[in-house]
């Protein structure tokens, strides 16, 4: 993630195999240049680990959620094991909008300025950018993704009717099909740390993006590895440049709901300063999170949540702790990462039996857990739900550890 070195272990692991090379000879290109190593969300992906679940654990009880929970009742209700921080709402689907006409100009995260004589209407986007654009009523003609579109957690709340696919496995892009769709613009999320455009490139190999540039101009929206909120702001800025009126009643209400959720989260954090969080991914060992490397939890820290930080990491993101020693990171509430690469119906109640020794963490033993669906938050509406679910979990938690 944000502060990992390339190739380091991170929560977005590729368990898929790249598709066969595409015949792009008529473009005058060497197809061998376009087969690159698989990539994780924040760098090159390592060999896949299966069954991965990351758990974010919060120490101590917390306060209210969505401004509706009385903090005097904190700890009197059980934490909802079925709460879904990536649940969809009516606000996740915004009707197509009439965009302002005229020329389009935008300087992207790579420092490139894209200038078009008219607003683009035929847009191809990666799954992150597509989800964000659709939250502003802009529907792409095609999407490339790391899983089939219908199973993508990032796209799960979007209306995909009529959208073509130009890639459904990690690091693949169907150049032939994309060219046949005659796009005006190709948009991908850009990670400045790794030079990664749409999970197709690395700092060492930009050939796939270079190839797409021969089909249509490419635009990289900056992924802020220190703040999910800032990444969403970047997408809002792009939507405005694409002619969307951000002050329409629906969009204004969505932003207002988000602001209210953040305000409530800050209230919860300020009222429960005994709360400390720690992130853990149970695999062969416990991977303990450095929260400053995660854009979601960097936001939560900036909003007042206290997080446990390990004494150093092995890769800039995780510190490996043996199961024999995991009790040293004891905690009161567990936020369980839903591994996108191995996504399935996670039953939180079953977690302790899958990882012997994991229940030495008090939160796991006491069944005080909630899911963490990292990577789904590319819009204000999706992030609002996540923030509300977490505030609710904090409000219901009991302190089950001793200082």
Predicted regions and their residues:
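Extracytoplasmic substrate-binding proteins
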Residues: 207-282, 376, 380-403
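Alpha-helical, coiled-coil/dimerization segments enriched in small aliphatic residues
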Residues: 241, 289-319
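Bacterial Sec-exported substrate-binding components of ABC uptake systems
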Residues: 2-3, 12, 16-19, 23-56, ...
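A short, structured surface patch at a secondary-structure boundary
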Residues: 122-181, 185-186, 190-201
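A local structural motif
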Residues: 113-119, 157-166, 247-253, 303-315
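Extracytoplasmic ligand-binding site segments that recognize negatively charged/polar headgroups
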Residues: 149-153, 192-207, 220-240, 273-298, ...
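Structured C-terminal subdomain patch of bacterial secreted/periplasmic proteins
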Residues: 230, 329-403
């Amino acid at each position: 993630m944000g502060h990992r070195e390339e190739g380091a272990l991170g929560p977005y692991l590729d368990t898929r195999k790249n598709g066969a090379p595409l015949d792009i000879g008529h473009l005058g290109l060497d197809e061998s240049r376009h087969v690159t190593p698989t990539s994780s969300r924040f760098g090159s992906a390592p060999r896949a680990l299966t069954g991965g679940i990351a758990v974010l654990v919060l120490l101590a009880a917390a306060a209210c959620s969505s401004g509706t929970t009385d903090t005097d009742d904190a700890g009197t209700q059980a934490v909802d094991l079925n709460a879904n921080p990536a649940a969809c709402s009516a606000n996740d689907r915004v009707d197509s909008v009439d965009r302002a006409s005229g020329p389009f100009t935008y300087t992207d995260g790579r420092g490139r300025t894209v200038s078009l004589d008219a607003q683009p209407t035929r847009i191809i986007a990666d799954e992150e950018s597509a989800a964000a654009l659709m939250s502003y009523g802009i529907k792409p003609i095609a999407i490339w993704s790391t899983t089939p579109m219908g199973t993508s957690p990032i796209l799960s709340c979007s209306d995909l009717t009529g959208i073509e696919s130009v890639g459904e496995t990690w690091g693949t892009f169907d150049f032939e099909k994309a060219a046949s769709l005659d796009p005006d613009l190709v948009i991908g999320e850009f990670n400045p740390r790794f030079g990664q455009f749409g999970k197709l490139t690395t700092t060492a190999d930009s050939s796939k993006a270079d190839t797409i540039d021969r089909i249509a101009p490419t635009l990289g929206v900056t992924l802020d590895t220190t703040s999910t909120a800032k990444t969403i702001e970047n997408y809002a800025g792009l939507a405005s440049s694409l002619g969307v009126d951000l002050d329409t009643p629906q969009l204004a209400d969505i932003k207002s709901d988000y602001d209210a959720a953040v305000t409530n989260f800050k209230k919860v954090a300020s009222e429960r300063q005994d709360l400390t969080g720690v992130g853990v991914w149970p695999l062969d060992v416990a991977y303990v999170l450095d929260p400053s490397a995660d854009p979601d939890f960097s936001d939560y820290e900036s909003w007042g949540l206290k997080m446990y930080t390990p004494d150093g990491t092995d890769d800039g993101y995780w510190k490996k702790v043996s199961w024999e020693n995991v009790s040293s990171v004891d905690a009161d509430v567990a936020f369980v990462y839903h591994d996108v690469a191995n996504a399935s119906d996670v039953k939180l109640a079953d977690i302790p039996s899958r990882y012997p020794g994991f229940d030495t963490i008090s939160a796991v033993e006491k069944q005080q857990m909630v899911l963490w669906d990292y990577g789904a938050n590319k819009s204000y509406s999706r992030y609002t739900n996540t923030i509300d679910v977490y505030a609710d979990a904090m409000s219901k938690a009991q302190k089950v550890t001793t200082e």
